[in-house]
Amino acid sequence: MKGLFVTIEGPEGSGKTTLIQGLLPYFEQKEQKVMATREPGGIAISEDIRTILHKQEYTMMEARTEALLYAAARRQHLVEKVMPALNEDYLVLCDRFIDSSLAYQGYARGLGMDKVFEINRFATEDCMPSLTIYLDIEPEVGLARIAKDAGREVNRLDMEDISFHKRVREGYLQVVERFSDRIVLVNADQPMEKLIEEVIQVIEDKLL
């Protein structure tokens, strides 16, 4: 693979999607081949899996089922969209990847990070990001942002209680420590303009 694979991670309301939309024009005007995508989703099969995962009424979904569905969506998205783009020398900006599964299912759901990592090693064939930006934010702040965003559809994970979202952040911080060679922690509780500038600097310093 010749391209650069950058993933953006963070708890609910950390600003991942808005950040990526802010990064795109910067790299486009530099004539960098760049593509934005998301997980779960990005292509038809994975978007269908996303719909299942996010349905509010599916509160009975068991943790292993959830982990396996995310891994399945990840596999299809990787082979159908991400890998071809990397082979065409694109900078791929992806909203979530394997670290989400480690934090949400591995830690917050209690499945164990090592078990979830092995599921995803199988799904990705050890394809890992060139760089991961983790947007750190207190759960209360992130959830308050979501509550104010009238255009954002509330999904099944948003409906979890605050203790779950606190565990997600704890899980992420463990993931950051475990993969410190790949992950850069950035404070997401700042104006989006400043966040975009900081992340651009990180990407350019680390990769370009």
Swiss-Prot record:
Coiled-coil portions: none
Pfam families linked to this entry: Thymidylate_kin (PF02223)
GO CC field: cytosol
Entry GO MF terms: ATP binding; dTMP kinase activity
Top EC class of this enzyme: transferase
GO BP of this protein: dTDP biosynthetic process; dTTP biosynthetic process; dUDP biosynthetic process
List of residues binding ATP: G10, P11, E12, G13, S14, G15, K16, T17
Enzyme Commission number(s): 2.7.4.9
Keywords: ATP-binding, Kinase, Nucleotide biosynthesis, Nucleotide-binding, Transferase
InterPro entries to which the protein is assigned, alphabetical: P-loop_NTPase, Thymidylate_kin-like_dom, Thymidylate_kin_CS, Thymidylate_kinase
Catalytic activity: dTMP + ATP = dTDP + ADP
Family, as annotated: Belongs to the thymidylate kinase family.
UniProt function note: Phosphorylation of dTMP to form dTDP in both de novo and salvage pathways of dTTP synthesis.
PANTHER family xrefs: THYMIDYLATE KINASE (PTHR10344), UMP-CMP KINASE 2, MITOCHONDRIAL (PTHR10344:SF4)
NCBIfam families cross-referenced by the UniProt entry: DTMP_kinase
The name this protein goes by in its record: Thymidylate kinase
